[in-house]
């Protein structure tokens, strides 16, 4: 097997609708430096948030995402040849949208993974030959919004289907040196992963994966390295994605392009910061976000309560934006919202579990986060708490 360096670039979230509708026509959508970074890799993996499918009779809302199939021309310019579609918008346009996306990918000699017409198809790994000892990838999506595929129905590979995930990882490791899990999950707009998300991703490493690359929060989060050389990148943030509801939140206009460099024996990475220029709808380079740093277990334990408090502040902003008449200027209504677990996104011990998040956030009053040595990370999180502390 060839032991020379083999590289893959992973982007953040991509959706050519809302403010990005039609932007695929602009050949200067991305700066030259971004194109150079993308083109420097052997493969480019994008997180495609929505179907390439646009019939006129679809009912569209703030949270609905589907794209004009013509947007594929922008993906070609990026040399994005692998599309991660195991996310909470891949099924917004139903099975027809999913099939359309996969058909367009095949016509453009691109691969898709993470969603399919059945559980078997959704869980099918992508294999990248024998370079660097061989690389295989799967993609998983969180409950409830990533509609889970079954033996006979279309959807995503559910991130809690541990038996199937472990089996696919084992299948990859039989023939490949490296296994990558793309994970679409975690709370939106949170600066750090909640403990149960972090534990789940570490669980994938224990199953045999070497790297986890995360999406869905729409903001960049930290990464974490381990003594055995394995890595988790909790969220790359947005790349080509801009909506009204996201503009209500901090840090949704920045993200990270991640390049993983493989040889048969070693894994390294490079990162490029990107910024969505909302005045003209283009994407440029910027400094790598301060939050995108290696936060080991001891520092995470110090910072997790402050990050949980910041997440609650962001979730409050979200609820006020979505339903201003119910939550705007009404602290009692917000108190009721955060004291219960009856909302539609709740999954016990896995997603939006306020029975876990609220007590963790309340622990921030102990000020142990002030003992963290990561001053820039603390400032990044505190920005979310303007007016809250």
Language model segments and positions:
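N-terminal catalytic scaffold of extracellular/periplasmic and nuclease hydrolases
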Residues: 1-86, 92-94, 101
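Active-site environment of divalent metal-dependent phosphoester hydrolases
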Residues: 17-19, 52-55, 88-102, 119-124, ...
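Short acidic, glycine-rich surface-loop motifs adjacent to enzyme active sites
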Residues: 41-52, 169-192
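Binuclear metal-dependent hydrolase catalytic cores centered on His/Asp/Glu-rich metal-binding motifs
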Residues: 19-32, 65-66, 129-179, 199, ...
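Active-site neighborhood of phospho(di)ester-bond hydrolases with catalytic His/Asp-centered motifs
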Residues: 10-12, 44-49, 78-88, 111-116, ...
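Active-site-proximal segments of metal-dependent phosphoesterases and phosphodiesterases across multiple
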Residues: 55-76, 178-210
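A short C-terminal boundary segment appended to hydrolase-like catalytic domains
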Residues: 249-251, 255-389
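Conserved beta-sheet core of the metallophosphoesterase superfamily
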Residues: 79-82, 195-256
């Amino acid at each position: 097997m060839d032991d020379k360096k083999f590289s893959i670039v992973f982007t953040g979230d991509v959706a050519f609708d809302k403010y990005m509708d039609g932007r695929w026509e602009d050949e200067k959508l991305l700066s030259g430096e971004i194109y150079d970074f993308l083109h420097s890799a052997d493969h480019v993996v994008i997180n495609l948030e929505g179907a390439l499918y646009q019939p006129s009779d679809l009912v569209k809302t703030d949270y609905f995402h589907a794209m004009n199939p013509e947007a594929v021309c922008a993906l070609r310019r990026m040399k994005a040849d692998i599309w991660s579609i195991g996310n909470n918008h891949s099924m917004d346009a139903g099975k027809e949208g999913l099939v359309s996306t996969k058909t367009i990918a095949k016509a453009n000699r691109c691969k898709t993974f993470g969603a399919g017409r059945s559980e078997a198809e959704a869980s099918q790994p992508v294999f990248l030959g024998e370079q660097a000892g061989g690389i295989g990838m799967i993609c998983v999506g969180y409950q409830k919004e990533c509609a889970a595929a079954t033996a006979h129905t279309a959807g995503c590979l559910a991130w809690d289907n541990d038996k199937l995930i472990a089996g696919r990882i084992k299948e990859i490791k039989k023939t490949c040196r490296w296994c990558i899990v793309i994970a679409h999950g975690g709370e939106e707009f949170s600066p750090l992963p909640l403990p149960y998300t972090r534990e789940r991703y570490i669980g994938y490493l224990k199953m045999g994966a070497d790297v986890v690359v995360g999406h869905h929060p729409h903001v960049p989060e930290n990464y974490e390295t381990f003594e055995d050389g394995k890595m988790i990148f909790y969220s790359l943030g947005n790349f080509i994605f801009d909506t009204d509801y996201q503009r209500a939140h901090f840090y949704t206009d920045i993200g990270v392009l991640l390049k993983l460099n493989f040889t048969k024996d070693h894994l390294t990475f490079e990162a490029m910061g990107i910024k969505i220029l909302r005045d003209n709808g283009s994407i440029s380079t910027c400094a790598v976000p301060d939050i995108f740093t290696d936060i080991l277990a001891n520092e995470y334990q110090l910072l997790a309560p402050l990050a949980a408090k910041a997440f609650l502040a962001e979730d409050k902003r979200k609820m006020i934006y979505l339903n201003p008449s119910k939550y705007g200027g009404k602290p009692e209504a917000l108190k009721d919202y955060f004291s219960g677990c009856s909302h539609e996104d709740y999954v016990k011990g896995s997603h939006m579990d306020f029975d876990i998040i609220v007590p963790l956030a309340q622990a921030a009053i102990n000020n142990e986060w002030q003992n963290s040595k990561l001053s820039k990370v603390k400032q990044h999180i505190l920005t979310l708490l303007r007016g809250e502390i």
